[in-house]
Amino acid sequence: MANELTWHDVLAEEKQQPYFLNTLQTVASERQSGVTIYPPQKDVFNAFRFTELGDVKVVILGQDPYHGPGQAHGLAFSVRPGIATPPSLLNMYKELENTIPGFTRPNHGYLESWARQGVLLLNTVLTVRAGQAHSHASLGWETFTDKVISLINQHRKGVVFLLWGSHAQKKGAIIDKQRHHVLKAPHPSPLSAHRGFFGCNHFVLANQWLEQRGETPIDWMPVLPAESE
């Protein structure tokens, strides 16, 4: 691959910025004081661990992690095996069933197999207090993930950005549409999916774009690690 830059190469400096160290410190001290924070510390940066910068083909932006027990593990929209598939992801599966021939809804919501194929599942805020949506929204994570998006915009070419809902669309406003392929739709949440997420055809359009560029399309059927061996 021509672009061998890693996340470490492009983010090392950002991770030394005072705001970022502050964010980490705040999260760490909340954990130490007994507050339950999701995802667990070891999983906070999983999106970057599973999808290296040079491998990014598709970016799906989420908002903040799931705040129920055992759900969040560092990949947007994904939940651990054995945890009930959340409503937004069920609606994503419904759209896949309606548009991808042969897609059958899996009995889990674990999307690591997407991440391993180059789908960056990036929440714009990387931690949350148990049971309190958006509780870490002002800690500095948004500044960090803005930087991540600008680095993908700058260092990669031909990435598909799937921007669902106004939050993701605002966040993605900086993306150069001459360099990248930006697709927008309402959020897959039950509150908005019927306003145009269903029928947006984004999973098909993303693959068509990748194929036109001579890249391998994404297999959108999520498989558990044991199934793919």
Swiss-Prot record:
Protein source organism: Escherichia coli O7:K1 (strain IAI39 / ExPEC)
As for what it does, the entry says: Excises uracil residues from the DNA which can arise as a result of misincorporation of dUMP residues by DNA polymerase or due to deamination of cytosine.
Q: Which GO terms describe its molecular function?
A: uracil DNA N-glycosylase activity
Kindly list the cysteine pairs connected by disulfide bridges. Answer: none
GO BP annotations of the record are: base-excision repair, AP site formation via deaminated base removal
EC number in record: 3.2.2.27
Primary localization: cytoplasm
Q: Where in the cell is it found?
A: Cytoplasm
* Protein name, as recorded: Uracil-DNA glycosylase
Question: Matching Gene3D superfamilies, A to Z?
Answer: Uracil-DNA glycosylase-like domain (3.40.470.10)
Keyword list, A-Z: Cytoplasm, DNA damage, DNA repair, Hydrolase
NCBIfam families named in the record: PRK05254.1-1, PRK05254.1-2, PRK05254.1-4, PRK05254.1-5, ung
Which family does the record assign? Answer: Belongs to the uracil-DNA glycosylase (UDG) superfamily. UNG family.
Q: Which CDD domains match?
A: UDG-F1-like
**InterPro entries cross-referenced by the UniProt entry:** UDG_fam1 (IPR002043), Ura-DNA_Glyclase_AS (IPR018085), Uracil-DNA_glycosylase-like (IPR005122), Uracil-DNA_glycosylase-like_sf (IPR036895)
Q: Which Pfam family is an annotated match for this chain, by its short name?
A: UDG
State the reactions this protein catalyses. Answer: Hydrolyzes single-stranded DNA or mismatched double-stranded DNA and polynucleotides, releasing free uracil
Q: Which GO CC terms are listed, alphabetically?
A: cytoplasm
Q: Where is the active site?
A: D64
Q: Which domain of life is it from?
A: Bacteria
